[in-house]
Protein backbone atom coordinates (compact mmCIF):
# COMPACT_ATOMS: atom_id res chain seq x y z
CA UNK A 1 0.00 0.00 0.00
CA UNK A 2 2.75 2.42 0.95
CA UNK A 3 4.57 1.82 -2.34
CA UNK A 4 1.41 2.77 -4.23
CA UNK A 5 1.00 5.86 -2.08
CA UNK A 6 4.57 6.99 -2.69
CA UNK A 7 4.18 6.57 -6.43
CA UNK A 8 0.97 8.56 -6.33
CA UNK A 9 2.82 11.42 -4.65
CA UNK A 10 5.52 11.69 -7.33
CA UNK A 11 6.92 14.22 -7.95
CA UNK A 12 6.80 16.34 -4.78
CA UNK A 13 3.02 16.18 -4.75
CA UNK A 14 1.11 18.86 -2.85
CA UNK A 15 -2.36 17.34 -3.26
CA UNK A 16 -5.33 18.57 -1.24
CA UNK A 17 -6.30 16.34 1.66
CA UNK A 18 -8.80 13.66 0.77
CA UNK A 19 -10.18 13.58 4.30
CA UNK A 20 -9.42 14.30 7.94
CA UNK A 21 -6.75 11.56 8.10
CA UNK A 22 -5.09 12.36 4.76
CA UNK A 23 -1.80 13.34 6.41
CA UNK A 24 -1.63 10.41 8.84
CA UNK A 25 0.81 7.56 8.26
CA UNK A 26 4.52 7.27 7.65
CA UNK A 27 4.64 8.19 3.97
CA UNK A 28 6.95 10.94 2.76
CA UNK A 29 6.57 12.58 -0.63
CA UNK A 30 8.98 11.27 -3.23
CA UNK A 31 11.44 13.62 -4.82
CA UNK A 32 12.58 14.02 -8.39
CA UNK A 33 11.16 14.22 -11.88
CA UNK A 34 11.58 12.10 -14.96
CA UNK A 35 14.00 13.89 -17.32
CA UNK A 36 13.34 14.18 -21.03
CA UNK A 37 15.80 11.50 -22.11
CA UNK A 38 15.50 12.52 -25.74
CA UNK A 39 16.21 16.22 -25.31
CA UNK A 40 19.33 17.66 -26.89
CA UNK A 41 20.53 19.05 -23.54
CA UNK A 42 20.14 15.72 -21.72
CA UNK A 43 21.87 13.83 -24.53
CA UNK A 44 24.77 16.28 -24.64
CA UNK A 45 25.17 16.22 -20.85
CA UNK A 46 25.03 12.42 -20.81
CA UNK A 47 27.61 12.10 -23.57
CA UNK A 48 30.05 14.51 -21.92
CA UNK A 49 29.76 12.97 -18.45
CA UNK A 50 29.93 9.44 -19.83
CA UNK A 51 33.20 10.33 -21.57
CA UNK A 52 34.64 11.54 -18.25
CA UNK A 53 33.42 8.38 -16.51
CA UNK A 54 34.96 6.15 -19.19
CA UNK A 55 38.25 8.01 -18.79
CA UNK A 56 38.02 7.53 -15.02
CA UNK A 57 37.51 3.77 -15.32
CA UNK A 58 40.37 3.43 -17.83
CA UNK A 59 42.75 5.23 -15.49
CA UNK A 60 41.61 3.17 -12.50
CA UNK A 61 42.24 -0.07 -14.41
CA UNK A 62 45.75 1.13 -15.28
CA UNK A 63 46.45 1.92 -11.61
CA UNK A 64 45.26 -1.54 -10.61
CA UNK A 65 48.09 -3.05 -12.67
CA UNK A 66 50.56 -1.59 -10.17
CA UNK A 67 54.16 -1.52 -11.35
CA UNK A 68 53.43 -3.22 -14.68
CA UNK A 69 53.57 -6.73 -16.09
CA UNK A 70 57.29 -7.32 -15.51
CA UNK A 71 57.12 -6.32 -11.84
CA UNK A 72 53.94 -8.34 -11.34
CA UNK A 73 55.51 -11.44 -12.90
CA UNK A 74 58.57 -11.12 -10.64
CA UNK A 75 56.31 -10.74 -7.60
CA UNK A 76 54.30 -13.86 -8.50
CA UNK A 77 57.49 -15.85 -9.20
CA UNK A 78 58.44 -15.38 -5.55
CA UNK A 79 55.31 -17.26 -4.48
CA UNK A 80 53.46 -14.12 -3.43
CA UNK A 81 49.87 -13.11 -4.05
CA UNK A 82 49.47 -9.73 -5.73
CA UNK A 83 48.36 -7.04 -3.27
CA UNK A 84 44.81 -6.89 -4.60
CA UNK A 85 44.59 -10.68 -4.45
CA UNK A 86 45.65 -10.47 -0.82
CA UNK A 87 42.81 -8.06 -0.10
CA UNK A 88 40.30 -10.23 -2.00
CA UNK A 89 41.34 -13.24 0.08
CA UNK A 90 41.17 -11.27 3.31
CA UNK A 91 37.72 -9.69 3.15
CA UNK A 92 34.48 -11.61 3.56
CA UNK A 93 33.46 -13.43 0.34
CA UNK A 94 31.13 -11.33 -1.81
CA UNK A 95 31.54 -8.21 0.32
CA UNK A 96 32.59 -4.88 -1.24
CA UNK A 97 35.94 -3.16 -0.78
CA UNK A 98 35.73 0.63 -0.56
CA UNK A 99 39.08 1.69 -2.02
CA UNK A 100 40.34 5.13 -1.07
CA UNK A 101 42.75 7.62 -2.64
CA UNK A 102 43.28 5.56 -5.80
CA UNK A 103 44.85 8.47 -7.67
CA UNK A 104 47.43 9.32 -5.01
CA UNK A 105 50.66 10.21 -6.82
CA UNK A 106 48.99 10.45 -10.25
CA UNK A 107 51.34 12.45 -12.53
CA UNK A 108 52.85 13.92 -9.38
CA UNK A 109 56.53 13.08 -9.86
CA UNK A 110 57.09 14.05 -13.50
CA UNK A 111 58.48 10.95 -15.22
CA UNK A 112 58.32 8.74 -12.11
CA UNK A 113 55.10 6.74 -12.21
CA UNK A 114 53.86 5.67 -8.77
CA UNK A 115 50.46 4.01 -9.36
CA UNK A 116 48.23 4.49 -6.34
CA UNK A 117 51.20 5.95 -4.48
CA UNK A 118 52.57 2.41 -4.14
CA UNK A 119 50.01 1.47 -1.49
CA UNK A 120 46.38 0.32 -1.45
CA UNK A 121 44.06 1.59 1.27
CA UNK A 122 40.39 1.01 1.84
CA UNK A 123 37.63 -0.37 4.01
CA UNK A 124 36.53 -3.98 3.86
CA UNK A 125 34.58 -6.37 6.04
CA UNK A 126 36.76 -9.03 7.69
CA UNK A 127 35.02 -11.71 9.78
CA UNK A 128 32.03 -9.38 9.87
CA UNK A 129 34.02 -6.38 11.13
CA UNK A 130 34.60 -3.24 9.05
CA UNK A 131 38.37 -2.74 8.94
CA UNK A 132 40.81 -0.28 7.42
CA UNK A 133 43.17 -2.27 5.19
CA UNK A 134 46.58 -0.80 4.29
CA UNK A 135 48.49 -2.94 1.80
CA UNK A 136 51.92 -2.15 0.35
CA UNK A 137 52.24 -2.79 -3.37
CA UNK A 138 55.72 -4.24 -3.81
CA UNK A 139 55.29 -4.19 -7.61
CA UNK A 140 55.62 -0.38 -7.41
CA UNK A 141 59.25 0.53 -6.63
CA UNK A 142 59.50 -2.44 -4.26
CA UNK A 143 56.79 -0.93 -2.07
CA UNK A 144 59.07 1.99 -1.17
CA UNK A 145 57.52 4.98 0.57
CA UNK A 146 57.34 8.15 -1.52
CA UNK A 147 56.09 11.33 0.18
CA UNK A 148 52.61 10.68 -1.23
CA UNK A 149 52.71 7.09 0.08
CA UNK A 150 53.16 8.45 3.58
CA UNK A 151 50.38 10.99 3.09
CA UNK A 152 48.00 8.31 1.82
CA UNK A 153 48.76 5.99 4.74
CA UNK A 154 48.33 8.83 7.24
CA UNK A 155 44.96 9.66 5.71
CA UNK A 156 43.88 6.02 6.00
CA UNK A 157 44.95 6.00 9.65
CA UNK A 158 43.08 9.27 10.26
CA UNK A 159 39.91 7.70 8.85
CA UNK A 160 40.45 4.61 11.00
CA UNK A 161 40.94 6.73 14.12
CA UNK A 162 37.91 8.97 13.48
CA UNK A 163 35.64 6.02 12.81
CA UNK A 164 37.21 3.48 15.19
CA UNK A 165 38.06 0.96 12.49
CA UNK A 166 40.58 -1.81 13.26
CA UNK A 167 43.68 -1.47 11.05
CA UNK A 168 45.16 -4.38 9.12
CA UNK A 169 48.60 -3.70 7.61
CA UNK A 170 49.65 -6.06 4.79
CA UNK A 171 53.36 -5.26 4.93
CA UNK A 172 55.67 -5.73 1.93
CA UNK A 173 57.96 -2.72 1.67
CA UNK A 174 61.61 -1.79 1.45
CA UNK A 175 61.04 1.34 3.55
CA UNK A 176 61.57 4.98 2.61
CA UNK A 177 62.40 5.94 -0.98
CA UNK A 178 65.87 7.33 -0.26
CA UNK A 179 66.18 9.84 -3.14
CA UNK A 180 63.19 11.69 -1.63
CA UNK A 181 64.02 11.06 2.03
CA UNK A 182 63.89 14.75 2.93
CA UNK A 183 60.15 14.73 2.18
CA UNK A 184 59.55 11.32 3.77
CA UNK A 185 61.43 11.24 7.08
CA UNK A 186 61.91 14.32 9.25
CA UNK A 187 58.68 16.34 9.63
CA UNK A 188 55.65 15.94 11.89
CA UNK A 189 53.42 14.39 9.24
CA UNK A 190 56.10 12.21 7.68
CA UNK A 191 56.86 8.50 8.08
CA UNK A 192 57.32 8.58 11.86
CA UNK A 193 53.74 9.76 12.30
CA UNK A 194 52.44 6.40 11.06
CA UNK A 195 53.97 4.68 14.10
CA UNK A 196 52.72 7.43 16.40
CA UNK A 197 49.22 6.79 15.04
CA UNK A 198 49.58 3.06 15.65
CA UNK A 199 50.47 3.68 19.29
CA UNK A 200 47.64 6.16 19.83
CA UNK A 201 45.04 3.92 18.18
CA UNK A 202 46.15 0.92 20.20
CA UNK A 203 45.81 3.01 23.37
CA UNK A 204 42.24 3.81 22.32
CA UNK A 205 41.44 0.11 21.82
CA UNK A 206 41.40 0.41 18.02
CA UNK A 207 43.03 -2.88 17.02
CA UNK A 208 46.33 -2.79 15.10
CA UNK A 209 47.10 -6.00 13.18
CA UNK A 210 50.15 -6.52 10.95
CA UNK A 211 50.74 -9.27 8.40
CA UNK A 212 54.38 -9.44 7.28
CA UNK A 213 54.27 -10.80 3.74
CA UNK A 214 57.58 -9.47 2.47
CA UNK A 215 60.31 -7.07 3.46
CA UNK A 216 59.84 -5.01 6.61
CA UNK A 217 63.04 -3.03 6.96
CA UNK A 218 64.44 -0.22 9.13
CA UNK A 219 61.66 2.02 10.49
CA UNK A 220 59.15 -0.23 8.76
CA UNK A 221 60.02 -2.95 11.27
CA UNK A 222 58.01 -1.00 13.81
CA UNK A 223 54.75 -1.73 11.95
CA UNK A 224 54.59 -5.35 13.20
CA UNK A 225 56.54 -4.58 16.38
CA UNK A 226 53.96 -1.96 17.41
CA UNK A 227 50.95 -3.99 16.32
CA UNK A 228 48.67 -5.58 18.92
CA UNK A 229 49.06 -8.87 17.08
CA UNK A 230 51.05 -9.87 14.01
CA UNK A 231 51.58 -12.71 11.55
CA UNK A 232 54.70 -13.45 9.48
CA UNK A 233 55.06 -15.65 6.39
CA UNK A 234 57.96 -18.13 6.53
CA UNK A 235 60.81 -17.73 4.01
CA UNK A 236 59.08 -14.61 2.70
CA UNK A 237 58.45 -12.14 5.48
CA UNK A 238 61.40 -10.47 7.20
CA UNK A 239 61.63 -7.96 10.04
CA UNK A 240 64.86 -6.16 10.88
CA UNK A 241 66.06 -2.68 11.73
CA UNK A 242 69.06 -3.16 9.42
CA UNK A 243 69.22 -5.53 6.47
CA UNK A 244 72.12 -7.87 5.62
CA UNK A 245 74.10 -5.29 3.57
CA UNK A 246 73.99 -2.70 6.37
CA UNK A 247 74.83 -5.32 9.03
CA UNK A 248 77.88 -6.38 7.02
CA UNK A 249 78.98 -2.79 6.51
CA UNK A 250 78.53 -1.93 10.19
CA UNK A 251 79.78 -5.10 11.89
CA UNK A 252 81.36 -7.30 9.24
CA UNK A 253 78.84 -10.05 9.99
CA UNK A 254 77.50 -11.96 6.99
CA UNK A 255 73.97 -13.23 7.53
CA UNK A 256 71.02 -14.13 5.30
CA UNK A 257 67.76 -12.18 5.45
CA UNK A 258 65.91 -15.25 6.77
CA UNK A 259 68.43 -15.86 9.57
CA UNK A 260 68.51 -12.17 10.43
CA UNK A 261 64.78 -11.54 10.61
CA UNK A 262 62.70 -14.42 9.28
CA UNK A 263 59.64 -16.17 10.67
CA UNK A 264 61.53 -18.83 12.64
CA UNK A 265 63.70 -16.27 14.42
CA UNK A 266 60.81 -13.97 15.36
CA UNK A 267 58.29 -16.67 16.27
CA UNK A 268 60.70 -18.96 18.18
CA UNK A 269 63.37 -16.65 19.66
CA UNK A 270 62.76 -12.90 19.59
CA UNK A 271 59.01 -12.96 20.21
CA UNK A 272 58.56 -10.08 17.76
CA UNK A 273 55.95 -12.13 15.84
CA UNK A 274 52.93 -13.97 17.20
CA UNK A 275 51.84 -16.27 14.37
CA UNK A 276 53.86 -18.29 11.84
CA UNK A 277 52.27 -18.73 8.39
CA UNK A 278 53.13 -21.15 5.60
CA UNK A 279 52.23 -18.76 2.78
CA UNK A 280 50.07 -15.75 1.93
CA UNK A 281 46.83 -17.75 1.94
CA UNK A 282 47.59 -19.17 5.39
CA UNK A 283 48.57 -15.74 6.72
CA UNK A 284 45.29 -14.21 5.56
CA UNK A 285 43.34 -17.11 7.08
CA UNK A 286 45.08 -16.45 10.40
CA UNK A 287 44.32 -12.73 10.07
CA UNK A 288 40.61 -13.44 9.74
CA UNK A 289 40.84 -15.52 12.93
CA UNK A 290 42.60 -12.67 14.74
CA UNK A 291 39.81 -10.27 13.76
CA UNK A 292 37.19 -12.81 14.86
CA UNK A 293 38.84 -12.87 18.29
CA UNK A 294 38.65 -9.10 18.74
CA UNK A 295 35.29 -9.63 20.43
CA UNK A 296 34.02 -6.54 18.60
CA UNK A 297 30.37 -5.61 18.21
CA UNK A 298 29.18 -2.54 16.34
CA UNK A 299 26.86 -0.37 18.42
CA UNK A 300 24.79 2.20 16.54
CA UNK A 301 23.69 5.60 17.84
CA UNK A 302 21.07 5.93 15.09
CA UNK A 303 17.87 4.19 14.05
CA UNK A 304 17.94 1.89 11.03
CA UNK A 305 15.16 1.24 8.53
CA UNK A 306 15.00 -1.29 5.67
CA UNK A 307 16.93 -0.08 2.63
CA UNK A 308 15.08 0.83 -0.56
CA UNK A 309 16.38 1.58 -4.03
CA UNK A 310 15.75 5.08 -5.43
CA UNK A 311 12.88 5.43 -7.90
CA UNK A 312 15.22 6.61 -10.67
CA UNK A 313 18.22 4.97 -12.42
CA UNK A 314 21.59 6.22 -11.14
CA UNK A 315 23.01 6.81 -14.62
CA UNK A 316 20.42 9.56 -15.20
CA UNK A 317 22.82 11.69 -13.16
CA UNK A 318 25.04 11.83 -16.25
CA UNK A 319 22.34 13.59 -18.27
CA UNK A 320 21.10 15.79 -15.44
CA UNK A 321 24.46 17.15 -14.29
CA UNK A 322 26.75 16.90 -17.32
CA UNK A 323 30.29 18.22 -17.53
CA UNK A 324 29.66 21.94 -18.10
CA UNK A 325 29.75 23.72 -14.74
CA UNK A 326 28.12 26.81 -16.26
CA UNK A 327 24.88 24.86 -16.69
CA UNK A 328 22.71 24.83 -13.61
CA UNK A 329 20.72 21.86 -12.31
CA UNK A 330 18.47 21.26 -9.33
CA UNK A 331 20.37 19.42 -6.60
CA UNK A 332 17.08 17.76 -5.62
CA UNK A 333 17.37 15.67 -8.79
CA UNK A 334 20.73 14.38 -7.51
CA UNK A 335 19.27 13.66 -4.08
CA UNK A 336 16.39 11.73 -5.69
CA UNK A 337 18.87 9.32 -7.26
CA UNK A 338 20.89 8.50 -4.16
CA UNK A 339 18.42 8.30 -1.24
CA UNK A 340 16.14 5.46 -0.21
CA UNK A 341 12.88 5.45 -2.15
CA UNK A 342 13.78 8.91 -3.51
CA UNK A 343 12.08 10.23 -0.35
CA UNK A 344 13.24 13.53 1.13
CA UNK A 345 11.70 15.65 3.88
CA UNK A 346 12.81 19.16 3.01
CA UNK A 347 13.53 21.67 5.76
CA UNK A 348 12.71 25.37 5.23
CA UNK A 349 11.88 24.73 1.56
CA UNK A 350 10.75 28.33 0.89
CA UNK A 351 13.48 30.16 2.80
CA UNK A 352 17.04 30.66 1.62
CA UNK A 353 16.25 28.51 -1.40
CA UNK A 354 19.76 28.54 -2.87
CA UNK A 355 20.57 25.97 -0.19
CA UNK A 356 18.54 22.76 -0.03
CA UNK A 357 18.35 21.06 3.36
CA UNK A 358 16.38 18.07 4.56
CA UNK A 359 16.22 14.55 5.92
CA UNK A 360 16.49 11.24 4.07
CA UNK A 361 17.93 7.75 4.44
CA UNK A 362 20.72 6.02 2.54
CA UNK A 363 20.78 2.23 2.87
CA UNK A 364 18.53 2.67 5.89
CA UNK A 365 20.83 5.10 7.71
CA UNK A 366 19.40 8.55 8.61
CA UNK A 367 21.12 11.43 6.84
CA UNK A 368 20.75 15.19 6.95
CA UNK A 369 21.52 16.59 3.49
CA UNK A 370 22.87 20.05 2.68
CA UNK A 371 23.02 20.75 -1.07
CA UNK A 372 23.79 23.84 -3.15
CA UNK A 373 21.34 25.34 -5.62
CA UNK A 374 23.24 28.53 -6.29
CA UNK A 375 25.30 31.18 -4.51
CA UNK A 376 24.90 31.44 -0.73
CA UNK A 377 22.98 34.45 0.58
CA UNK A 378 22.54 35.42 4.24
CA UNK A 379 19.22 33.55 4.36
CA UNK A 380 20.84 30.42 2.91
CA UNK A 381 23.68 30.55 5.43
CA UNK A 382 21.35 31.03 8.41
CA UNK A 383 19.18 28.17 7.18
CA UNK A 384 22.24 25.94 6.81
CA UNK A 385 23.41 26.85 10.32
CA UNK A 386 19.98 26.03 11.78
CA UNK A 387 19.88 22.68 9.98
CA UNK A 388 23.38 21.64 11.06
CA UNK A 389 22.43 22.43 14.66
CA UNK A 390 19.30 20.26 14.34
CA UNK A 391 21.30 17.31 13.02
CA UNK A 392 23.86 17.64 15.81
CA UNK A 393 21.11 17.74 18.43
CA UNK A 394 19.51 14.60 16.96
CA UNK A 395 22.72 12.63 16.23
CA UNK A 396 21.95 12.58 12.49
CA UNK A 397 24.99 12.28 10.15
CA UNK A 398 25.43 15.04 7.57
CA UNK A 399 25.96 14.82 3.82
CA UNK A 400 27.17 17.92 1.97
CA UNK A 401 26.61 18.06 -1.81
CA UNK A 402 28.94 20.80 -3.03
CA UNK A 403 28.28 22.81 -6.17
CA UNK A 404 29.14 26.26 -4.95
CA UNK A 405 30.68 29.44 -6.34
CA UNK A 406 30.80 31.03 -2.89
CA UNK A 407 28.91 33.57 -0.81
CA UNK A 408 27.14 36.54 -2.41
CA UNK A 409 29.25 39.70 -2.68
CA UNK A 410 28.45 43.39 -3.08
CA UNK A 411 27.71 46.47 -0.95
CA UNK A 412 24.07 45.54 -0.33
CA UNK A 413 24.97 42.09 0.95
CA UNK A 414 27.89 43.29 3.06
CA UNK A 415 25.53 45.80 4.70
CA UNK A 416 23.07 42.99 5.43
CA UNK A 417 25.81 41.04 7.22
CA UNK A 418 26.77 38.30 4.75
CA UNK A 419 30.17 38.00 6.49
CA UNK A 420 28.72 37.24 9.92
CA UNK A 421 25.98 34.99 8.51
CA UNK A 422 28.50 33.03 6.46
CA UNK A 423 30.69 32.80 9.55
CA UNK A 424 27.79 31.22 11.46
CA UNK A 425 27.53 28.43 8.91
CA UNK A 426 31.29 27.89 8.78
CA UNK A 427 31.44 27.72 12.59
CA UNK A 428 28.49 25.32 12.81
CA UNK A 429 30.03 22.99 10.23
CA UNK A 430 33.43 23.15 11.95
CA UNK A 431 32.01 22.30 15.39
CA UNK A 432 29.57 19.58 14.26
CA UNK A 433 30.61 16.25 15.81
CA UNK A 434 28.17 14.05 13.91
CA UNK A 435 29.73 12.10 11.02
CA UNK A 436 30.14 14.47 8.06
CA UNK A 437 30.64 13.31 4.49
CA UNK A 438 31.26 15.69 1.60
CA UNK A 439 30.72 15.04 -2.10
CA UNK A 440 31.80 17.62 -4.68
CA UNK A 441 29.36 17.30 -7.60
CA UNK A 442 30.25 20.53 -9.42
CA UNK A 443 32.26 23.57 -8.44
CA UNK A 444 33.88 24.04 -5.04
CA UNK A 445 35.10 27.62 -4.87
CA UNK A 446 36.29 30.03 -2.22
CA UNK A 447 34.61 30.34 1.16
CA UNK A 448 31.74 28.25 -0.18
CA UNK A 449 34.09 25.28 0.17
CA UNK A 450 34.44 26.11 3.86
CA UNK A 451 30.72 26.51 4.56
CA UNK A 452 30.01 23.25 2.74
CA UNK A 453 32.50 21.19 4.77
CA UNK A 454 35.62 21.19 2.62
CA UNK A 455 38.72 19.20 3.57
CA UNK A 456 39.75 21.68 6.26
CA UNK A 457 36.54 20.94 8.19
CA UNK A 458 37.37 17.27 8.78
CA UNK A 459 34.63 15.42 6.95
CA UNK A 460 34.97 11.70 7.68
CA UNK A 461 35.15 11.18 3.90
CA UNK A 462 35.37 13.56 0.94
CA UNK A 463 34.69 12.37 -2.61
CA UNK A 464 34.64 14.16 -5.93
CA UNK A 465 32.95 13.56 -9.29
CA UNK A 466 35.09 13.64 -12.47
CA UNK A 467 33.33 16.79 -13.73
CA UNK A 468 34.08 18.76 -10.57
CA UNK A 469 36.49 21.62 -9.99
CA UNK A 470 38.05 22.88 -6.75
CA UNK A 471 39.83 26.21 -6.46
CA UNK A 472 39.90 29.49 -4.54
CA UNK A 473 37.93 30.90 -7.51
CA UNK A 474 37.30 30.13 -11.17
CA UNK A 475 40.13 30.67 -13.65
CA UNK A 476 38.32 33.40 -15.60
CA UNK A 477 37.40 35.21 -12.39
CA UNK A 478 41.00 35.04 -11.15
CA UNK A 479 42.28 36.28 -14.51
CA UNK A 480 39.82 39.20 -14.48
CA UNK A 481 40.81 40.17 -10.93
CA UNK A 482 44.53 40.14 -11.73
CA UNK A 483 43.95 41.96 -15.02
CA UNK A 484 42.01 44.71 -13.22
CA UNK A 485 44.75 45.11 -10.62
CA UNK A 486 47.43 45.25 -13.33
CA UNK A 487 45.42 47.73 -15.42
CA UNK A 488 44.95 50.06 -12.43
CA UNK A 489 48.64 49.81 -11.54
CA UNK A 490 49.69 50.64 -15.11
CA UNK A 491 47.30 53.60 -15.11
CA UNK A 492 48.85 54.97 -11.93
CA UNK A 493 52.26 54.66 -13.58
CA UNK A 494 51.00 56.39 -16.73
CA UNK A 495 51.53 53.26 -18.83
CA UNK A 496 49.29 51.61 -21.42
CA UNK A 497 47.61 48.24 -20.87
CA UNK A 498 46.27 47.13 -24.24
CA UNK A 499 43.72 44.41 -24.94
CA UNK A 500 46.60 42.30 -26.26
CA UNK A 501 48.46 42.79 -22.97
CA UNK A 502 45.33 41.78 -21.09
CA UNK A 503 44.86 38.62 -23.17
CA UNK A 504 48.52 37.68 -22.70
CA UNK A 505 48.15 38.10 -18.94
CA UNK A 506 44.91 36.14 -18.68
CA UNK A 507 45.76 33.10 -20.80
CA UNK A 508 48.38 31.46 -18.50
CA UNK A 509 46.30 32.26 -15.40
CA UNK A 510 43.21 30.55 -16.81
CA UNK A 511 45.32 27.59 -17.91
CA UNK A 512 46.96 27.28 -14.47
CA UNK A 513 43.65 27.45 -12.60
CA UNK A 514 42.08 24.89 -14.93
CA UNK A 515 44.99 22.49 -14.38
CA UNK A 516 45.10 22.94 -10.60
CA UNK A 517 41.32 22.81 -10.19
CA UNK A 518 41.07 19.47 -12.00
CA UNK A 519 39.87 16.53 -9.85
CA UNK A 520 42.92 14.44 -10.82
CA UNK A 521 45.23 17.21 -9.58
CA UNK A 522 43.32 17.17 -6.30
CA UNK A 523 43.24 13.40 -5.94
CA UNK A 524 46.94 13.02 -6.80
CA UNK A 525 47.74 15.12 -3.73
CA UNK A 526 45.23 13.31 -1.48
CA UNK A 527 43.08 16.43 -1.09
CA UNK A 528 40.10 14.08 -1.38
CA UNK A 529 39.40 10.41 -0.74
CA UNK A 530 38.74 9.49 -4.34
CA UNK A 531 37.17 10.38 -7.67
CA UNK A 532 33.99 8.36 -8.04
CA UNK A 533 31.60 7.48 -10.85
CA UNK A 534 28.35 9.42 -10.20
CA UNK A 535 26.45 6.17 -10.80
CA UNK A 536 28.33 4.60 -7.85
CA UNK A 537 27.55 7.47 -5.48
CA UNK A 538 24.82 5.76 -3.48
CA UNK A 539 26.93 2.65 -2.81
CA UNK A 540 30.03 4.67 -1.88
CA UNK A 541 28.03 6.87 0.49
CA UNK A 542 26.29 3.88 2.05
CA UNK A 543 29.59 2.13 2.76
CA UNK A 544 31.07 5.36 4.10
CA UNK A 545 28.19 6.11 6.48
CA UNK A 546 28.24 2.50 7.67
CA UNK A 547 31.96 2.79 8.45
CA UNK A 548 31.52 6.16 10.16
CA UNK A 549 28.88 4.79 12.51
CA UNK A 550 31.37 2.41 14.15
CA UNK A 551 32.37 5.34 16.34
CA UNK A 552 30.00 6.72 18.99
CA UNK A 553 28.61 10.15 18.10
CA UNK A 554 30.00 12.77 20.45
CA UNK A 555 28.11 15.74 21.83
CA UNK A 556 28.55 18.95 19.82
CA UNK A 557 29.42 22.21 21.55
CA UNK A 558 29.13 25.42 19.55
CA UNK A 559 31.09 28.60 20.14
CA UNK A 560 29.90 32.18 19.80
CA UNK A 561 27.71 33.05 16.81
CA UNK A 562 27.88 36.75 15.92
CA UNK A 563 24.26 37.92 15.78
UniProtKB/Swiss-Prot annotation:
One of its GO terms (molecular function) is ATP binding. Changing residue 68 to V: In MCC2D; uncertain significance. Changing residue 310 to R: In MCC2D; mild form. One of its GO terms (cellular component) is mitochondrial matrix. The modification N6-acetyllysine is found at residues 70, 495, 511. The keyword Transit peptide applies. Changing residue 200 to N: In MCC2D; uncertain significance. Changing residue 146 to N: In MCC2D; has some wild-type residual activity. GO terms for biological process: branched-chain amino acid catabolic process; coenzyme A metabolic process; L-leucine catabolic process. Residues 343-372 are annotated as: Acyl-CoA binding. The modification N6-succinyllysine is found at residues 70, 141, 495. It is an enzyme of class 6 (ligase). PANTHER family: ACETYL, PROPIONYL, PYRUVATE, AND GLUTACONYL CARBOXYLASE-RELATED (PTHR22855), METHYLCROTONOYL-COA CARBOXYLASE BETA CHAIN, MITOCHONDRIAL (PTHR22855:SF13). This is Methylcrotonoyl-CoA carboxylase beta chain, mitochondrial. It comes from Homo sapiens.
